[in-house]
């Protein structure tokens, strides 16, 4: 809901006449938002013999269905002083208050074999925040947003985010400089603190808040299709999922396999991440080339593994036929990243986790080439692609 005033605006109709209209100028806005999230996840596994062989734990016995639910209701009220209602209001200012209620339903066991109950974990969080922003004009824009949790499960959690862009005309082109930064002190998500399922189970009540600080800059040259980005980030108390599988040995002590398990880990030190990226788009007639090269470095590769070098290229033709009624785009793209210990995937929780240190596999340093054709005829689109054409025929 907006409060403001009307002012007169003059528009020239003819050389000898002027039209005067009333234009509403908002000064103050009252804000209310309601966000309701309902999430369900069901893990189904009927092969109990395989489960007993593959997993270290089977907490729910022979149950084939494992379910978890999450409900979140968030109310936010605020008041905003609008930007530009007079010549002194160079920026907009907003203050808000948020309350969030969360409920997590997890399956639990009892002392009676085969009996299951639902454990409900209820959390709430009350936070205050503010925003300062400048959206009008062509030269400079910025936005600063801060929020602090003052009560509830997340008390003490805070975040301050800022972004801005400066647009300059240089040699007939627009040069844009973007700067983004944030500092966040956040509570680990609920499922890192508590989780109960058929194969994984943990309660971590001693996890510290995660402190993240990031600074990033981006330079864009519109005419040349060039974009250069670089950023640094520091993470303290990085919290992650790890593959905690245990080895299975034969009578002679040789490892014959692993019993799968997962666990939450928290690294109490600092992890630094540096990222630099170059994006370039070229066009000559109907031929297009889009390229991207990125370099990133993690100070703790065992904790937060990243490929140092990754690249993407897309070479294609784009043209129209039949008076441009049929639009055609066809070409090939290639993806590449250097070798690194990529995370494993766990279907039990639908998440990636760090590889088991006793059974690590390094992947990468091999390009993946795809060819494709994309045809657009009025309201109908046809798309065909052959994936990884450079693989050997028996591996496709």
Predicted feature locations:
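Exposed, low-structure sequence patches enriched in small/polar residues
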Residues: 2-49, 55-56, 60-396
């Amino acid at each position: 809901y907006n409060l403001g005033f009307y002012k007169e605006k003059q528009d020239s109709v003819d050389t000898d006449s002027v039209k005067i209209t009333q234009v509403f100028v908002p000064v103050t806005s009252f804000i209310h938002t309601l966000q309701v999230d309902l999430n369900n996840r069901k893990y189904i596994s009927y092969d109990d013999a395989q489960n007993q062989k593959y997993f270290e734990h089977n907490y729910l016995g022979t149950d084939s269905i494992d379910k978890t639910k999450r409900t979140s209701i968030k109310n936010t009220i605020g008041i905003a002083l609008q930007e530009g209602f007079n010549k002194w209001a160079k920026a907009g200012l907003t203050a808000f208050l948020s309350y969030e209620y969360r409920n997590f339903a997890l399956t639990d066991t009892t002392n009676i074999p085969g009996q299951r109950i639902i454990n409900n974990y209820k959390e709430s969080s009350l936070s205050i925040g503010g925003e300062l922003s400048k959206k009008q004009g062509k030269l400079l824009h910025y936005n600063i947003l801060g929020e602090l949790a003052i009560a509830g499960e997340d008390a003490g959690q805070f975040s301050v985010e800022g972004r801005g862009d400066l647009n300059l005309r240089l040699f007939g082109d627009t040069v844009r400089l973007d700067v983004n930064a944030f500092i966040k002190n956040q509570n680990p998500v609920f499922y890192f603190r508590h989780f109960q399922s058929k194969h994984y189970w943990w309660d971590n009540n001693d996890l510290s808040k995660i402190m993240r600080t990031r600074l990033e800059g981006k330079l864009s040259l519109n005419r040349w299709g060039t974009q250069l980005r670089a950023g640094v980030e520091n993470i303290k108390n990085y919290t992650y999922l790890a593959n905690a599988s245990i080895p299975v040995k034969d009578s002679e002590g040789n490892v014959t396999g692993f019993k799968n398990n997962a666990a939450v880990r928290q690294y109490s030190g600092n992890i630094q991440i540096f990222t630099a990226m170059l994006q370039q788009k070229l066009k000559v007639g109907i031929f297009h080339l889009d390229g991207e090269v990125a370099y990133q470095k993690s100070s703790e590769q065992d904790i937060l593994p990243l490929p140092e070098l990754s690249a993407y290229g897309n070479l294609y033709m784009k043209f129209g036929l039949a008076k441009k009624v049929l639009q055609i785009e066809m070409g090939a793209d290639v993806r590449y990243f250097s070798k690194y210990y990529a995370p494993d995937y766990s279907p039990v929780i639908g998440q990636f986790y760090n590889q088991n240190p006793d059974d690590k596999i390094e992947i990468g340093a091999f390009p993946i080439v795809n060819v494709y054709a994309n045809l657009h005829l009025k309201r109908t689109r046809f798309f065909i692609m052959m994936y990884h054409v450079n693989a050997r025929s028996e591996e496709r």
